[in-house]
């Protein structure tokens, strides 16, 4: 008699995805972040559901309802800060996950990679709309500034902005629809994540060497289930430390002031995980150009499979491109720092140089270094 997990229609899917899945024996801890993203998503959906039970998406009561959650709901403060800081952990895992994919050449799995880019846009949209919901100063002005960027779209721009606002400014209609979208998107993300895994399991996982690992596979369970469990424990430990000791470390104090359309905060800036893109947006002194650069800063990931010139997949044995990769990582940290600074000298010029460097490394230097390494190794 066959095992039920191998015969039952539902359990069979789970078995092929998480139990008997043949996995490369040498994947490192950088491969833990996919499962951590799944844990983050589940955590966000659960905490978000409980927050939605007490939140009201009306401009007159939204801010008070969040205060009510923190003051009067049993462990409401915990749920709220788990949700807010859970988003930060989500993005830390997301950036590491994408960075791993770039480093080890995982972008050669085209379908998996492209679904991943769509997932990234969906997560960013969800986080942006979630930031608007508490209806603090930074919520309101962030929503105003970012939605206004759509007015740069030629011909239909202004109509598009008013259509998204549901009026002539960010108001009740905007908040209500943002709440609706913020609620539905995580479920769409969960569905997309399943498609992401479906395509990944068509090809099998990549590994640090970038070589074919068909000859050396081990079952996912118990090896990687245990390894993932350790990652989950560390993630929850980090999140717990953040929530219980430094709940407002990554937030903006301006968001503790109720939204006021008549009073602009001195420095409008998004949450830390958007600062790199915000810095790229601000570094171009033209509205449409800035918006295009903003979108391209993420969409450029879709070009990576076509810019791959090396005969080797991974950067593991490619010191020149490795150096460029870490310069790119440092450049992203620089952009993140600049995005949080006021628009004045010397921050403007640093941001512009960092933005140029970002696109240059990806579009010019990395493809060239791939060719150079091929020549050195006599692969061309």
UniProtKB/Swiss-Prot annotation:
A ubiquinone binds at residue 201. Its main location: mitochondrion. Binds 2 heme b groups non-covalently. Heme b b566 binds at residues 97, 196. It holds the Pfam family Cytochrom_B_C. It is a multi-pass membrane protein. One of its GO terms (biological process) is mitochondrial electron transport, ubiquinol to cytochrome c. One of its GO terms (cellular component) is mitochondrial inner membrane. The keyword Transport applies. It comes from the Eukaryota. Keywords: Electron transport, Heme, Iron, Membrane, Metal-binding, Mitochondrion, Mitochondrion inner membrane, Respiratory chain, Transmembrane, Transmembrane helix, Transport, Ubiquinone. It is found in: Mitochondrion inner membrane. One of its GO terms (molecular function) is ubiquinol-cytochrome-c reductase activity. SUPFAM superfamilies: a domain/subunit of cytochrome bc1 complex (Ubiquinol-cytochrome c reductase) (SSF81648), Transmembrane di-heme cytochromes (SSF81342). Its cofactor is heme b. The keyword Transmembrane helix applies. CDD domains: cytochrome_b_C, Cytochrome_b_N. Heme b b562 binds at residues 83, 182. The cytochrome bc1 complex contains 11 subunits: 3 respiratory subunits (MT-CYB, CYC1 and UQCRFS1), 2 core proteins (UQCRC1 and UQCRC2) and 6 low-molecular weight proteins (UQCRH/QCR6, UQCRB/QCR7, UQCRQ/QCR8, UQCR10/QCR9, UQCR11/QCR10 and a cleavage product of UQCRFS1). This cytochrome bc1 complex then forms a dimer. Heme 1 (or BL or b562) is low-potential and absorbs at about 562 nm, and heme 2 (or BH or b566) is high-potential and absorbs at about 566 nm. Belongs to the cytochrome b family. This is Cytochrome b. It comes from Brachyuromys betsileoensis. The lineage of its organism: Eukaryota, Metazoa, Chordata, Craniata, Vertebrata.
């Amino acid at each position: 008699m066959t095992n039920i997990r191998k015969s039952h229609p539902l359990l069979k899917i789970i078995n092929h995805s998480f139990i008997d899945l043949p996995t490369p024996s040498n994947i490192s801890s950088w491969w833990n972040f996919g499962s951590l993203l799944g844990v983050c998503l589940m955590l966000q959906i659960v905490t978000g559901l409980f927050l939605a039970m007490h939140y009201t998406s009306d401009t007159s009561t939204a801010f008070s309802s969040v205060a009510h959650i923190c003051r009067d709901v049993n462990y409401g403060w915990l749920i709220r800060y788990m949700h807010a800081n859970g988003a930060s952990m989500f993005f830390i895992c997301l950036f590491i996950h994408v960075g791993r994919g770039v480093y080890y050449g995982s972008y050669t799995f085209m379908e998996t990679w492209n679904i991943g880019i769509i997932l990234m846009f969906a997560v960013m949209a969800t986080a942006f709309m979630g930031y608007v919901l508490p209806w603090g100063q930074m919520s309101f002005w962030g929503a105003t500034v970012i939605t206004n960027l759509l007015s740069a779209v030629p011909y239909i721009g202004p109509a598009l902005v008013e259509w998204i606002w549901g009026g002539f400014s960010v108001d009740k209609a905007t908040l209500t629809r943002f709440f609706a979208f913020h609620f539905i998107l995580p479920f769409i993300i969960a569905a997309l994540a399943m498609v992401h895994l479906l395509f990944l399991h068509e090809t099998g996982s990549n590994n640090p060497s970038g070589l074919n690992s068909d000859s050396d596979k081990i079952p996912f369970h118990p090896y990687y289930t245990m390894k993932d469990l350790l990652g989950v424990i560390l993630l929850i430990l980090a999140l717990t430390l953040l929530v219980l000791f430094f709940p407002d470390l990554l937030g903006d104090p301006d968001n503790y002031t109720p939204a006021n359309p008549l009073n602009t905060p001195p420095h409008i800036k998004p949450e830390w995980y958007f600062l790199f893109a915000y810095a790229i947006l601000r570094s171009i002194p033209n509205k449409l150009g800035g918006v295009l650069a903003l979108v391209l800063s993420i969409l450029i990931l879709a070009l990576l499979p076509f810019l791959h010139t090396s005969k080797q997949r991974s950067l593991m044995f490619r010191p020149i491109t490795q150096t460029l990769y870490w310069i790119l990582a440092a450049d992203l940290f620089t952009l993140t720092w600049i995005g949080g600074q006021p628009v004045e000298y010397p921050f403007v010029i640093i941001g512009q140089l960092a933005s140029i460097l970002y696109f240059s490394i990806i579009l010019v230097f990395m493809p060239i270094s791939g060719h150079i390494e091929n020549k050195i190794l006599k692969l061309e």
